[in-house]
């Protein structure tokens, strides 16, 4: 049988699992009831997971379990219980986002295959290389990559690369969306996204400016396979079984060289049709769409038709059989799938009164494998002359043998737990004085004399600092280059050149918000300050960041204050203490007009249903941040953050005068005036 990249289907519940497997998926991904990125799905029970895995393995289908949410220190004991259950069930891989959880899995179950969730924001070769260093076997690449960018990563890594080929497209780069948590205390990074992006945000009079059409690349699977993609992922653990059946069937058709039934796919679920905009590098307004009444009506019309796809099990696994019939002895049938071998005994053959059983008659009876995952590939007969076995006896022999083979295939093999490792490095000493105050500037124009005098550490985006190297001539040790939040593979070399040149001019440190930028800074020989985008909210994640080379870390602004206080980190920690929090990282700016970027100078906005404007800040025309309209203020609560080593004032759209005034408020402890937010620091996040 020709080997192809796997079709990986979502299984939000038992019905979806059955639809995926019976329609021909090679693998499924599913979550337990807790600690997965689709908490709203039916999900699976820890106690019955071994049976689920066994049923899939009997059919040659791999099972990946998603443990891909951020977890607090307080939740770790319960999460460890889930991990142990997953390992005991003999699954084929575990998807994670949290750096700390990846660290624990690698230490506790070193042979359990580790998969990097798309929430890890892997979008370049540097990020993939760092995952390899951490022991990952498979990576889900960011959805925002083009054909050429996918090819570059596949060619440069030994990991299996997984790519989304069908389903919903998030507006934000996965793992970097905080819109649901900041607006509604339901974190997408913790599996609770409320999808506020599907609400009616307006841009230049255009509605639903954060709602993208669904993706489909189902007609390009052979092309993707040629690029080196090893796994075709279908999104949709919240979708109906019919959706899963249609998507898997379309993928099967595509891999067989047929034209996939996109019309049925569009009918079962779409948002004004489909897009392939990121893959084809056409990041424009044609990518946007919403779910219409017509879309819903089309779905109702095809659901009955799709239910027929999952009525019968189709054999997918070839087996070889050996039938032995000797005088006076029970007939035996041995069956093998190439790995497992079973043998069963049946009735004693009789002397034939008419036609004896020959290989042709036996083949006709034994090839009827319907209702099982098997089909007969080869039959060898050792049949004594003049013997006869009734067809009913041959059928019973076949059924018993195939049942025994399925049972042998379904035996789960738990992963061994490694001996407890030595204790983690000792935590850092708590700061003796007040936290150091630093400023992150969006542009060099915000660099005022007051900022230069009053802030300890100063950071600028890499491209800004590269254009103003004279800033390093005095106090170079204070400056930090903020690496791009999104750096496509073709931009990596330019980033490395800029880093090395700035280092020659005195730069000593870099601010890194993803794994790719972390590795680039490390290879440039710079001190590394982990940024909020690393999503650190627990002690193991802080320890893993230190192991990867971070000298200091900025905790996620989704980390509640009490949880932050209790993080045991071997390196200094800090938080964002002021700023318009970045709610989304975007590669397709919703502020574009039909003419493109036009005369936009990097600052734009979209407007919600209440008339509130959300700023859009473009970085070097490479990516855009959607910002919270209300700035985070802690200026009057600073004593409550004395456990931090540093606090960062994150300036974005502020004028130089506003930057000066805000810095003075933090120096004096003044209370904020006007609309502001405390962010998520004093809220309980779901």
Describe the function of each predicted region.
Residues 2-122, 140-144, 149-231, 238-544, ...:
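Active-site pocket-lining/capping segments in soluble small-molecule metabolic enzymes
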Residues 134-135:
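Hydrophobic alpha-helical bundles that form the membrane domains of multi-pass transporters
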């Amino acid at each position: 049988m020709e080997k192809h990249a796997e079709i990986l289907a979502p299984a939000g519940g038992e019905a979806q699992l059955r639809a995926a497997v019976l329609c021909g998926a090679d693998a499924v991904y599913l979550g337990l009831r807790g600690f997965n990125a689709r908490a709203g799905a039916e999900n699976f029970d820890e106690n019955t997971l071994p049976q689920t895995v066994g049923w899939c393995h009997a059919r040659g289908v791999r099972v990946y379990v998603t443990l891909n949410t951020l977890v607090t220190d307080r939740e770790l004991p319960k999460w460890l219980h889930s991990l142990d259950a997953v390992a005991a069930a003999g699954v084929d891989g575990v998807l994670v986002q949290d750096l700390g959880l990846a660290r624990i899995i690698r230490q506790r179950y070193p042979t359990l295959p580790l998969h990097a969730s798309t929430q890890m924001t892997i979008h370049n070769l540097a990020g993939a290389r760092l995952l390899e260093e951490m022991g990952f076997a498979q990576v889900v690449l960011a959805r925002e990559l083009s054909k050429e960018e996918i090819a570059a990563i596949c060619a440069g890594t030994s990991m299996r690369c997984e790519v989304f080929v069908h389903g919903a497209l998030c507006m934000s780069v996965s793992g970097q969306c905080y819109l649901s948590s900041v607006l509604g205390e339901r974190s997408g990074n913790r599996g609770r996204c409320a999808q506020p992006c599907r609400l009616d945000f307006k841009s230049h009079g255009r509605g639903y400016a954060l709602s993208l059409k669904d993706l489909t690349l189902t007609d390009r699977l052979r092309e993707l396979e040629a690029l080196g993609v090893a796994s075709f992922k279908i999104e949709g653990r919240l979708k109906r079984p019919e959706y899963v059946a249609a998507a898997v069937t379309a993928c099967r058709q595509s891999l067989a060289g047929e034209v996939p039934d996109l019309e049925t796919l569009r009918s079962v679920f779409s948002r004004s049709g489909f897009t392939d905009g990121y893959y084809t590098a056409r990041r424009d307004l044609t990518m946007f769409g919403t779910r219409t009444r017509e879309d819903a009506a089309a779905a109702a019309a095809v659901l009955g038709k799709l239910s027929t796809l999952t009525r019968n099990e189709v054999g997918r696994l070839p087996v070889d059989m050996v039938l032995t019939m000797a005088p006076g002895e029970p007939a035996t049938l041995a069956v093998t799938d190439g790995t497992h071998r079973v043998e069963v005994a049946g009735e004693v053959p009789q002397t034939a009164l008419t036609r004896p059983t020959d290989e042709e008659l036996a083949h006709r009876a034994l090839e009827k494998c319907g209702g099982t995952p098997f089909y007969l590939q080869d039959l060898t007969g050792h049949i004594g002359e003049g013997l006869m076995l009734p067809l009913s006896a041959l059928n019973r022999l076949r059924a018993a043998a195939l049942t025994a083979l399925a049972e042998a295939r379904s035996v789960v093999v738990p992963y061994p737990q490694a001996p407890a490792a030595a204790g983690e490095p000792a935590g850092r000493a708590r700061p003796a004085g007040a936290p150091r105050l630093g400023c992150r500037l969006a542009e060099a124009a915000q660099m005022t004399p007051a900022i230069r005098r009053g802030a300890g550490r100063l950071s600028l985006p890499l491209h800004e600092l590269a254009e103003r190297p004279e800033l390093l001539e005095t106090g170079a040790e204070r400056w930090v280059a903020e690496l791009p939040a999104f750096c496509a593979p073709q931009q990596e070399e330019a980033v490395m050149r800029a880093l090395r040149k700035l280092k020659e001019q005195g730069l000593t440190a870099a601010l890194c918000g993803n794994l790719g930028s972390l590795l680039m800074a490390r290879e440039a020989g710079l001190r590394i300050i982990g940024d909020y985008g690393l999503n650190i909210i627990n002690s193991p994640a802080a320890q893993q960041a230190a192991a990867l080379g971070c000298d200091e870390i900025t905790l996620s602004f989704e980390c509640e204050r009490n949880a932050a206080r209790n993080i045991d980190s071997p390196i200094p920690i800090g938080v964002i203490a002021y700023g318009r929090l970045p709610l989304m990282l975007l590669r397709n700016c919703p502020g574009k007009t039909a003419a493109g970027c036009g005369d936009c100078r990097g600052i734009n906005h979209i407007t919600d249903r209440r008339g509130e404007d959300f700023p859009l800040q473009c970085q070097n025309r490479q990516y855009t941040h959607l910002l919270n309209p209300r700035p985070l203020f802690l200026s009057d609560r600073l004593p409550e953050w004395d456990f931090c080593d540093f606090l960062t004032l994150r300036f974005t759209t502020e004028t130089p005068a506003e930057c000066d005034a805000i810095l003075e408020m933090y120096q004096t402890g003044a209370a904020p005036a006007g609309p502001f937010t405390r962010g998520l620091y004093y809220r309980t996040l779901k």
